[in-house]
Curated annotation (Swiss-Prot):
It comes from Lactococcus lactis subsp. cremoris (strain MG1363). The gene is rexA. Its EC number is 3.1.-.-, 5.6.2.4. ATP binds at A25, S26, A27, G28, S29, G30, K31, T32. This is Exonuclease/helicase subunit RexA. Gene3D superfamilies: 1.10.10.160, 3.90.320.10, P-loop containing nucleotide triphosphate hydrolases, PCRA, domain 4. HAMAP family: AddA.
Length: 1203
């Protein structure tokens, strides 16, 4: 292997020491490589690896760094000729598993557990990692605290009347959800500070103390209006001289009058004399009309004048920037009158928040369960209050190394300060990739060091890694051209200059000269009026955008590009369902990294929630009927109507079922034998489930329902079956988490879920296996750190999310609370109304200041998000957006006015929430970017669409959980049905046959038919048959079904090409299993598979392996003589040139190898079914079938099944 040639900057980053070092590592510059090599060099110099503190942003990054270090340390040891150095490297390898390599959260947990007595907590605390549990506890604390304050408890520091005013300021119509949202927002923000109580007590009201009037606002409040005024005056002066404004007439007089007041207006702004400023502006007439001209050049100037005047001044109905400023002044003058009342509300809010924070923390101490932020605060307290511990750690660690430093929070920064000796920090990151502001990371921490370390007098060191070893020059040049004109100190928080620009470092891989075929491509879908309107404020994506991208992807695949080398990046996962469906219709394999959206609204979960609601309360008609109509019981509308007419319309449906069973209803003759048997079977199961509610945990009950009704198998056989099954598993996990938190009872669980749905909340997505060769769809944020040959950025026209700028509170670290205040203007002399009150919600001065700060920070972060997205592409970048064909200003004409101010795009276009497409098109017009632009329509899509066989749509196989508001009504047609009720259908067997069956159902049906014809079924002496008594299950016991499902999921995730302990453990950690399940998955045992010849074969043929392979096949039932579809999923197969190697995992437990023959016999029919499906699908005659037995003693057994 050839020696890697280091750049001078990389070499410096690896070997420099004795000072704090900040490595600004641009995208693709090899920062992980540099960090690993620096650690290896430290070990060579004699520093033990456990004396290095190495903090990573995620657990995955820590695991990957460990694996990389293991490889690099081994390589260094092999190449070392120094025995002492080799010994040091060997020692480092031995201690690698114990080295402090991990997230800051993992370190603070370890520190807190080791010093629990210093903060008076139990060392056996657990982490509230499950959002459901922390939400439950927080909600209970909040509700109890609100109840206390409303009870007029005199011991509290807010009176009942004042507390009611506080709630009303943030909530509507006696609903406290608005107030609750405010409290949770402040709590989350405070928790990200290094000392929440201190911040709440000392900084929370700082804005109200600082900004009491308009004149207290900083220069930022007036800087834009000064610039706009100067621009307006210059426009008028130029227009008076170039003939745009006529030499005589009213227009010229108005312009001269405005210019006569020029100096007075500017002076009033400078002095913050807002009364004079407003009066002057309102006194002058800005309605200057210039008409048109036959002269083409003059006409263009007149048109430009009108456009600029509209932007700068506007009209009363459509104000421009100057009129908006005057409105802000008038608003400010009004809020000054209510400043004291607003401050009183803010003070009471501060008291309540502090009380809530302390009460919630005390509750968590009682539960001995904490959030990550709590543990971080405990760790800070330990180090601050205990110099002995702090100094011991400072002496222990030779160096403090931090990866992804740009995403550091103030809490983490405080930890680093306490651990460092002042000159041993090694920080690696890229300010241009700081995109986690929503997690309260502060890029300002990196930026302050970036600027100060660059000063000659600063003893610390800044090292820039600029070379990009990932991407072609076309991608890098385009990225540089965008950001050098987009970012500056004012907006972007830094200048994107020569030192920040990306430099191509992989000259040997890619040519230096640009090739037009690899220019980034902007694909704009021109949507016509017959299609859905573009939603300016939403991130909705149109079919046309996705189809345009799909056709380009299809071409790439035809040219030989592997699907796994293509990624689609989206703003949010809300469009995932639509993207997946359309790509599949083009026969493009696709995987959604973050799953399909709306877990709680997925068909299978909705059905199970209705089942739980019905079990909890069978008198709830909607859920009961929905359950009956679902695939679990399969009652059709005719049958439900027959039941419905057994009683009056106001009688509960459950009572009608009981009447039907007893044949005591109004129309008992309608309950035929078939329906009666169906009702009895339902009632038996349903009654049993209801009896078990108080005997077994909810998650056990769910699994009993899944298995008894074959519903788990059923949804697994549908389209997206794996995701559906994962959703059902997730519902069970949520139920278990709920109960493990100390909460009991189905009623409360159903209430919790209902509350989530009422608030349009969702539960966390579920982890499923990722196909190895498929186009990946993920959010921009999720893509950080990854790379793909071809990258498609979708939905670029969507607006930036500016909802945070409209919330009732906006917070900042410096100024604390900014809030809106609801004032009753009835007392104002200018307000005339017949209503008893005139409530107006207005922005306080601290709110205005925080809003301005947040808006600039948000736009700066959006720029960085775009930078991250661009730099994922290795070879080519595709940008996909949409324009209208009706409104000219929404099309490309709007960008004719885009210009540069110096080297930067004008603020008119930069300082906008209209989205990435708005920036790119503006820059395209202003600078002519090195990219290709293609506009296409729906008609062009249809004519150019590649003809491929679409996958069948199986969605109709299962209907949504329906709500039958009218099912209870009587139908006259039912009486006609009586005439045919006794008709005997000649193909009764076919009516009992499901049109779609899973392999398990086929196997069960075959077994039942064999019993009917009189065959005796032998029971193996090695297989003990018993009836499971669910009432005996303890809350912590794991069922075989759950373990089997978890083990199968792990085998689907595991990368067989990296079959080692580190890799498999990392995979297991990522899958999010419950700890009890995770601890029972024996990775060491699973790895014995790869000691076998078959395991080695799998490792060597990963590229030919298809895991989790779905199939469907038409078969004929020998008894019903009818055809039916078998759909299922086999665990995997390897497709070779002349044959297919089929394999399936089995987790059946056995202790004696003599039981293997019985297991093989048990699954022979199932494997033959899979084999038959593969033969028909691939037209291959030879299918070798193997069972991988994971449940045996000590190791994995591989057994071939003979025909």
């Amino acid at each position: 292997m050839s020696e890697v040639k280091l750049t001078p900057e990389q070499n410096e980053a690896i070997h420099s020491s004795g000072k704090n070092i900040l490595v600004s590592a641009s995208a693709g510059s090899g920062k992980t490589f540099v960090m690993a090599q620096r650690i290896v060099e430290k070990v060579k110099q004699g520093i033990e690896i456990d004396r290095l503190f190495i903090s990573t942003f995620t657990k995955k990054a820590a695991s990957e760094l460990r694996m990389r270090l293991e490889r690099d340390l081994k390589k260094a040891r092999q190449e070392s000729s120094d025995d002492e150095e080799a010994h040091r490297l060997t020692l480092a390898l031995q201690n690698l598993s114990n080295a402090d390599i991990g997230t800051m959260d993992s370190f603070t947990q370890k520190l807190t557990k080791a010093n629990f007595n210093r903060v008076n907590i139990d060392p056996n605390f657990r982490i509230l990692a499950d959002q459901t549990e922390s939400d439950l506890i927080r909600q209970e604390v909040f509700e109890q605290l609100v109840e206390s304050y409303l009870s007029a408890d005199e011991s509290l520091n807010i009176s009942k009347d004042k507390f009611e005013k506080l709630i009303k300021n943030f909530s509507k119509d006696r609903n406290i959800l608005g107030f609750q949202k405010v409290v949770y927002t402040i709590y989350r923000f405070a928790s990200a500070t290094e000392n929440p109580i201190s911040w709440l007590e000392n900084q929370f009201l700082k804005g109200f103390e600082t900004y009491k009037s308009l004149t207290d606002l900083s220069e930022d409040f007036t800087v834009n209006v000064k610039e706009n005024l100067l621009t307006f005056f210059e426009l008028l002066e130029n227009s008076l001289t170039n003939g745009v404004i006529a030499k005589k007439g009213a227009g010229r007089d108005k312009a001269n009058l405005i210019l006569d007041n020029k100096n007075e207006l500017l002076e009033a702004i400078s002095k913050k004399d807002f009364v004079t400023c407003t009066a002057l502006f309102l006194s002058i007439d800005t309605d200057i009309r210039v008409g048109s001209s036959k002269d083409e050049a003059l006409s263009a100037l007149k048109k430009d004048f009108s456009a600029q005047k509209q932007d700068l001044v506007g009209s009363k109905s459509k104000p421009g920037e100057l009129r908006k400023f005057v409105d802000k002044i008038k608003h400010g003058q009004l809020i000054e009158k209510y400043q004291n009342q607003a401050f009183e509300i803010a003070s009471d809010l501060q008291k309540f928040i502090i009380d809530f924070y302390k009460t919630y923390l005390e509750r968590k101490k009682n539960e001995n369960a904490f959030e990550y932020s709590d543990i971080a605060h405990f760790a800070i307290e330990i180090l601050e209050e205990n110099p002995d511990i702090r100094e011991n750690l400072r002496e222990h660690y030779d160096e403090i190394m931090i990866d992804e430093y740009q995403d550091t929070s103030h809490t983490q920064e405080r930890m680093l300060e306490l651990l460092s000796n002042g000159h041993n920090l090694f920080m690696v990151g890229d300010i241009k990739q700081s995109i986690y502001g929503f997690r309260l990371a502060d890029p300002g921490l990196f930026l302050e060091k970036y600027k100060s370390y660059d000063q000659a007098e600063n003893p610390n060191q800044l090292i820039r890694l600029k070379e990009n070893f990932r991407s072609r020059g076309e991608v890098l040049n385009f990225t540089n051209d965008i950001f050098k004109h987009l970012m500056d100190e004012k907006l972007g928080e830094m200048t994107y200059g020569k030192e920040e620009a990306l430099v191509q470092g992989n000259i040997s891989d890619y040519p230096v000269e640009a090739e037009k075929d690899f220019y980034p491509e902007l694909l704009l879908y021109k949507e016509n009026t017959s299609e859905e309107e573009i939603e300016d404020s939403e991130v909705k994506i149109s079919d046309g955008e996705i189809k345009g991208a799909a056709q380009e992807i299809k071409k790439l695949i035809e040219y030989g590009v592997e699907p796994k080398d293509i990624a689609i990046l989206v703003r949010s996962k809300s469009n995932n369902n639509k993207i997946e469906d359309i790509l599949l219709s083009y026969d493009i394999p696709v995987v959604l990294d973050e799953g399909r959206v709306d877990f709680l609204k997925s068909m299978e979960v909705l059905i199970m929630l209705d089942v739980l609601r019905a079990i909890d309360n069978p008198l709830y008609d909607l859920s009961l009927v929905a359950m009956l109509r679902s695939p679990l019981f399969g009652f059709n509308e005719d049958e439900l109507t027959r039941i419905s007419v057994q009683g009056s319309r106001d009688l509960r449906f459950w009572d009608k079922i009981l009447l039907s069973l007893k044949k005591e209803g109004k129309n008992p003759e309608l309950i035929n034998l078939s329906l009666e048997q169906k009702l009895k079977a339902f009632n038996q199961k349903f009654t049993e489930w209801r009896k078990l509610v108080n005997k077994i945990p909810i998650h056990r009950l769910l699994w009993k329902i899944y298995t008894e009704t074959y519903y788990f198998d059923y949804v697994g056989a549908l389209k997206n079956g794996e995701m559906r099954q994962a959703n059902l598993q997730a519902l069970s996990v949520r139920a278990e988490s709920y109960e493990s938190s100390g909460y009991k009872g189905l009623f409360k669980f159903v209430r919790l879920i209902n509350k989530f749905m009422e608030q349009n909340n969702d539960l966390a997505s579920v982890n499923i296996k990722l196909p190895q060769n498929a186009v990946r769809v993920m959010t921009f944020h999720k893509s950080k750190g990854l790379e793909f040959d071809y990258v498609f950025l979708m939905n670029l026209q969507s607006r930036f999310n500016d909802r945070d700028l409209k919330e009732d509170v906006i917070l900042s670290r410096e100024h604390g609370l900014g809030m809106k205040y609801i004032a009753d203007l009835k007392a104002e002399p200018d307000v005339i109304t017949d209503f008893p009150y005139a409530l107006v919600k207005m922005e306080t001065f601290p709110y205005m200041v925080n809003k301005d700060l947040k808006q600039r920070a948000a736009l700066s972060e959006e720029m960085r998000v775009l930078y991250v997205a661009f730099t994922r592409a290795k070879k080519k970048l595709y940008l996909v957006g949409k324009i209208k064909d009706t409104d000219k200003k929404a099309g490309l004409e709007l960008y004719d006015a885009a210009t540069l101010e110096g080297k930067i795009l004008s603020d008119k276009f930069r300082n906008s929430s209209r989205g990435f497409q708005h920036w790119i098109l503006a820059l395209q017009n202003a600078t002519k970017l090195p990219m290709k632009l293609n506009v296409y329509t729906k008609d062009e899509l249809e004519t150019e669409k590649l003809e491929f066989t679409s996958q069948p749509d199986f969605k109709k196989l299962v209907e949504e959980s329906e709500k039958f508001d009218n099912i209870m009504s009587f139908s006259d047609e039912i009486k006609e049905a009586q005439k045919i009720m006794n008709y005997q259908y000649p193909h009764q067997a076919a009516t009992e046959l499901s049109s779609i069956q899973t392999p398990s159902q086929v196997k069960k049906r075959s077994y039942e038919k064999q019993l009917q014809v009189g065959e005796v079924q032998p029971v193996s002496e090695f297989v003990r048959v018993k009836n499971l008594d669910f009432s005996d299950f303890g809350p912590k016991k794991i069922t075989a079904a759950e373990m089997g499902s978890a083990t199968h999921s792990f085998m689907q995730y595991a990368d067989f090409s990296q079959a080692d302990l580190f890799s498999f453990q990392a995979t297991l950690d990522e899958m999010g299993f419950d700890e009890k399940i995770k601890n029972q998955i024996d990775i060491t045992k699973i790895l014995t598979l790869f000691d076998t010849e078959f395991g080695q074969f799998l490792s060597e043929n990963v590229d030919k392996t298809v895991k989790e392979a779905p199939f469907s096949m038409l078969r004929t039932d020998e008894f019903a003589k009818e055809q039916y579809i078998v759909r299922g999923i086999c665990d995997g197969f390897v497709k070779l040139a002349d044959k297919i190697i089929l394999f399936d995992y089995k987790t059946d437990r056995f202790t004696n190898v003599s039981a293997i023959s019985e297991i093989k016999e048990r699954y022979k029919d199932q494997m033959n079914l899979y084999s038959e499906a593969l033969q028909k699908a691939y037209h291959v005659n030879q299918i070798d079938k193997y069972l991988i037995l994971l449940g045996g003693p000590r190791k994995v057994f591989v057994e071939k099944i003979d025909d």
